[in-house]
């Protein structure tokens, strides 16, 4: 069996889903009293009169085959009662009775009837007359297909079923099918391991689904069973449960999620067919986004955001491959689409492709969510905080609480852009109170004094400030302009250590050292470097400064700091009157 055929056993077809949603009526067996009397001799007559005659058995087989074909034709026309009459005539031949029982069970399922007794009868036939039915591979294959028909796989629909559709699913029907699994578990106990594993895993999955539909917490024992049964189906449902918990509660058990993602990655690597199933790959890429977003092991935030955007784009493209209205209703479609746009805004990189230029998003340009996201994107470009607030309020119906962190970062970045690109180049002096008013709306987007001072200081530290400034914290003013770009002077060094005026004068001539601590020239921060490249850059800078110091026999930073550390608290107190604030 190919990988595609093998995985097909795990996916629910439309026919399976429709039969799953049918109501269960009753377990009354059909009335056989009106069976049509056939003029030919019945199988029982053959069995009683022909004995061991080979010709008689061949005739029985041929007659039963004819009855089976007739019943199958009636079943294909949805004439289930008539079909059942013909199938019931095939008792005399074990192989044709086995086939007939399968068709009767399928007919009962189509009519919403219980199949408990028919199942027991079929498995009793298999246990007593297995050799007369056929090879084990044929029997086990038939049983496997029948199991998937009676208790279809619900796994792929756990995350991809809208809440309204979930509420329409009859939980009692699901519980009835779970009871079939109890019968199947006993019946396949003596069969091959594949069938036993299939029934065991299916029981766990149905148990999870029942708790999900009831909005109940999944028992710890059930989750442990999922982890213990290493299987594509169990890992896929675990992946979906992690995603669902994150979306609903903003909770991620990162260590467990990383393990499940790694296992799913191995399944996809080892099976080309599995790696091409969009329902699987879309959840996988979204889960990889979660591991990146929630991980704290990031030295380069831009690199992390770029990877997040890539995973969400892959997720959205896989969802688009599902196609049709089903895709439009998927929960992940909305979240991945918003995540792509949000990550793009946070990257703040004009060289990257605008998300709305993607073909998969272009086809949805009339969608309400896409229209809102385009408005949000334009407000962000215009640095219009009031319009941005209105867009975010309209988006509240679409996103889950976990997006709040992203949105807070987007608002902060928009405020920073407006400060340095609109306000600072325009004003030479502005009161802090007026500046705060320009960076807030008074409703959901706020800016207090501490936040503003933090923004100003961080902008200098991160080299995102486009204009030099000076703070007057006595009068609460901020001054912008190139004139506030001044080097450190020797008398200002005296403020730090009044006893080291001579040493300060020596150091002030060492502009290499001043450049290294960002006091003389404009701060220079290496952009888009990995952690290793950044450390190499810093090492090279230190070597250059050390060699220059040795060549001129001038004091180094280390010697200055060592001397500075010998100042006593009393010495500093005596000279406290000379302390003043710097730019």
From Swiss-Prot:
Location relative to the cell: Cytoplasm; Nucleus
Record domain PCI: where: 297-485
PROSITE patterns: PCI
Residue ranges, compositional bias (Acidic residues): 1-35
An annotated GO cellular component: cytoplasm
InterPro entries from the UniProt entry: PCI_dom (IPR000717)
Transmembrane segment boundaries: none
Region described as Disordered: spans on this chain: 1-55
Swiss-Prot/TrEMBL keywords: Cytoplasm, Nucleus, Signalosome
Oligomeric and partner information: Component of a COP9 signalosome-like (CSN) complex.
Descriptive protein name: COP9 signalosome complex subunit 10
């Amino acid at each position: 069996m190919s990988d595609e055929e093998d995985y097909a056993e795990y996916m629910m077809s439309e026919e399976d889903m429709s039969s799953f949603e049918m109501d269960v009526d009753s377990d009354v067996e059909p009335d056989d009293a009106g069976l049509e009397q056939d003029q030919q001799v019945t199988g029982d007559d053959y069995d009683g009169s022909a004995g061991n005659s080979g010709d008689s058995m061949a005739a029985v087989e041929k007659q039963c085959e004819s009855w089976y074909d007739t019943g199958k034709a009636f079943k294909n026309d949805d004439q289930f009662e008539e079909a059942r009459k013909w199938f019931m005539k095939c008792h005399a031949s074990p192989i044709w009775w086995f086939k007939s029982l399968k068709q009767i069970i399928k007919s009962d399922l189509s009519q919403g009837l219980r199949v408990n007794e028919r199942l027991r009868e079929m498995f009793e036939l298999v246990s007593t007359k297995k050799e007369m039915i056929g090879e084990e591979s044929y029997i086990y294959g038939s049983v496997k297909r029948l199991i998937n028909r009676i208790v279809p796989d619900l796994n792929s629909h756990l995350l991809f079923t809208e809440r309204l559709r979930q509420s329409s699913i009859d939980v009692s029907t699901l519980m009835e099918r779970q009871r079939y699994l109890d019968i199947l578990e006993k019946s396949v106990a003596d069969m091959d391991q594949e069938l036993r594993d299939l029934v065991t895993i299916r029981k766990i999955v149905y148990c999870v689904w029942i708790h999900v539909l009831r909005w109940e917490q999944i028992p710890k024992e059930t989750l442990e069973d999922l982890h213990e049964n290493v299987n594509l189906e169990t890992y896929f449902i675990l992946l979906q449960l992690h995603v669902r918990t994150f979306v609903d509660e903003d909770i991620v058990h990162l260590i467990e999620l990383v393990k499940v993602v790694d296992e799913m990655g191995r399944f996809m690597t080892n099976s080309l067919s599995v790696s091409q199933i969009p329902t699987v790959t879309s959840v996988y890429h979204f889960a990889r986004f979660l591991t990146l977003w929630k991980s704290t092991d990031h030295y380069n935030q831009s690199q992390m955001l770029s990877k997040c955007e890539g995973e969400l784009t892959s997720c959205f493209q896989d969802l688009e491959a599902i196609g049709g209205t089903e895709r439009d209703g998927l929960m992940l479609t909305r979240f991945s689409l918003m995540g792509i746009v949000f990550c793009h805004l946070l990257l703040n990189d004009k060289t990257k492709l605008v998300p709305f230029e993607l073909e998969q998003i272009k086809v949805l340009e009339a969608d309400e969510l896409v229209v809102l996201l385009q408005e949000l994107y334009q407000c962000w470009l215009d640095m219009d905080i009031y319009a941005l607030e209105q867009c975010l309020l309209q988006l509240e119906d679409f996103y889950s609480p976990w997006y709040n962190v992203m949105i807070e970062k987007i608002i902060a970045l928009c405020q920073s852009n407006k400060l340095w690109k609109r306000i600072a180049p325009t004003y030479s002096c502005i009161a802090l109170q007026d500046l705060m008013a320009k960076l807030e709306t008074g409703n959901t987007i706020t800016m207090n004094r501490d936040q503003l001072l933090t923004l100003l200081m961080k902008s200098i530290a991160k080299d995102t400030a486009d204009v030099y400034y000076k703070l007057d914290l006595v009068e609460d003013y901020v001054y912008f302009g190139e004139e506030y770009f001044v080097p450190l002077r020797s008398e200002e060094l005296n403020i730090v250590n009044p006893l080291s005026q001579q040493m300060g004068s020596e150091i002030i001539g060492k502009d290499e050292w001043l450049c290294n601590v960002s006091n003389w020239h404009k701060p220079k921060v290496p952009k888009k470097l990995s952690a290793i490249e950044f450390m190499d850059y810093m090492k090279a800078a230190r070597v250059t400064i050390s060699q220059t110091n040795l060549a001129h026999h001038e004091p180094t930073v280390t010697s200055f700091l060592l001397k500075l550390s010998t100042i006593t608290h009393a010495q500093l107190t005596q000279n406290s009157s000379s302390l003043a604030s710097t730019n």
